[in-house]
Amino acid sequence: MSGLGIMLLTLLLLVFMETSHQDAGEKQATQRDAINVRRRRSLTRRVTEECEENCEEEEKHCCNTNNGPSCAPQCFG
């Protein structure tokens, strides 16, 4: 095989390795994002349940505010 053929095969191999590495990185990032979304949902659900339980004892409503959920006689917005 000539030197040009070897260089061409080497180049193709490098391109293949680089693209498969990028695909693996994108897949890993997607999985990481999915895990973060699940954690946020479970945390939000837990906070909301606690808020509803606490507000129910005070006979108030659990309202979402800028500072997070809080108890109020009536929710606005």
Swiss-Prot record:
InterPro entries: Conotoxin (IPR004214). Its main location: secreted. Coiled coil: none annotated. Residues 1-22 form the signal peptide. Keywords: Amidation, Cleavage on pair of basic residues, Disulfide bond, Knottin, Neurotoxin, Secreted, Signal, Toxin. Transmembrane segments: none annotated. Expressed by the venom duct. The keyword Disulfide bond applies. GO terms for molecular function: ion channel inhibitor activity; toxin activity. This is Conotoxin ArMSGL-0143. It is found in: Secreted.
